[in-house]
From Swiss-Prot:
Predominant localisation class: periplasm
Gene Ontology terms: cellular component: outer membrane-bounded periplasmic space
Enzyme Commission no: 5.2.1.8
Name the UniProt record assigns to this protein: Chaperone SurA
Residues of the signal peptide: 1-27
GO biological process, one term: protein folding
EC top class, as a word: isomerase
Gene name of this polypeptide: surA
Alphabetical list of InterPro entries matching this protein: OMP_Chaperone_SurA, PPIase_dom_sf, PPIase_PpiC, PPIase_SurA, SurA_N, Trigger_fact/SurA_dom_sf
A GO MF term: peptidyl-prolyl cis-trans isomerase activity
Organism: Burkholderia pseudomallei (strain K96243)
Compartments where located: Periplasm
Swiss-Prot/TrEMBL domain comment: The PPIase activity resides only in the second parvulin domain. The N-terminal region and the C-terminal tail are necessary and sufficient for the chaperone activity of SurA. The PPIase activity is dispensable for SurA to function as a chaperone. The N-terminal region and the C-terminal tail are also required for porin recognition.
Pfam families named among the record's database cross-references: Rotamase (PF00639), Rotamase_3 (PF13616), SurA_N (PF09312)
Functional description taken from the UniProt entry: Chaperone involved in the correct folding and assembly of outer membrane proteins. Recognizes specific patterns of aromatic residues and the orientation of their side chains, which are found more frequently in integral outer membrane proteins. May act in both early periplasmic and late outer membrane-associated steps of protein maturation.
Amino acid sequence: MKKILRFAAVASGLVASLITVAPSASAQALRAQGASLADEVVAVVNNDVITGRELDQRVGLIARRLQQQKAPVPPTDQLRAQVLNQMVLERIQVQRAKDDGIVVDNATVQATLGRLAQANGMQLDQYKARIEAQGVPWDLFVRDARTELMLSKLREKEVDSKITVSDAEVASYIASQRGPNAGSQQDLRLEHIFVKAPANAPQADIDVAQKKAEGLLQQALASGANFERLAKNQSEADDAKKGGDLGFKSPASLPSDVVDAVSKLRPGEVNPTLIRVPDGFEIVRLVERRASQNPAASPKIVQTHVRHILLRVGEGKSESQARQQLIDIRRQIESGGDFEKFARTYSQDGSASQGGDLGWISPGETVPEFERAMNTLQDGQVSNPVRTEYGYHLIQVLGRRDAEGSVQQQMDIARQAIGQRKAEQAYSDWLRELRDSSYVQIKLPVAQ
């Protein structure tokens, strides 16, 4: 039986994170600074400007997001400086996208907003009301969604489409994960402080950067040092606002020099020497280790036995009608109705004759929205209506099992991991080059 085909979907990280928000002390402090700062130019970016009003609006959103995530909100001046630098990078990319003729039409924006609403169990009008009730203007929300889609297309054109992964790299990666020490492979959670110093920079500039990095290293090594705070205040990496936290990484996804350095560290320790990387200097702290969760390090994959009911949209049935019908069906199933009978009667998928049964599905065999919803379900649980490009689905998980991954599946996993690592590094390099080639004048003193 043919499975639901995969397709690439763009999701808006910024707008998706602004769902449940509350007023913050930082936002109130910003308003207290007075309206006189609202139209002040805080940055010149090539032939464009960023105003104080734009900055304060974005800072308010970020502060509320941090509060929602129960993360500490930095002091107002520090947060404004960090957000302004983010906005400068964003504005430069938007300018480049426009120069490249990249546009995002209204239909694409609406489709993305629809997926965000569906992911939160709402229809679009409900989602809009929720966003506005939290103090976020809907037109700003839509504009940010369009911007993120534009920048995603720009990155695909300028960076991701140029990434190649050879069969030799795949073979080497799999060998490193499945070698004699595969059973003891550990993922590493690291924090880092980055000081920019491209290899092609004048030697005098490299010397200045190295001196700065050495000073920061001594601060990081000092007894009682707060590495996270130091990274937030001093790191020149994009993740500075997160305290330089890289999350868990497999050794194969990290530069070999970094892996070698942290192999000698205990959790909580800072590497005592600087690490020279192509575009600067790294100060690294090992936070913790854990058993590897990289699928390529194990021949096992988790398969899911799943069935579904699909109602297509546009065949005499509107979005709201399809969704409401599935809500009604789900209610009957929850009250003791037979999922299989409902699937045979109502489903518009080829699996209807089998009661909606798709059999055992491996990771990556379904469209992302379907797989994400499926992965959140317990055995026997029925999902709320899930929107994909095919229509609306009710999904029920019947069971899960460990299975041997095929050679091709392991190769695909390895290729994806290598490609992601190379793409992230290439994107970081490309952003720095784009920033260096742009005219930027920061007029906000604390951001300098």
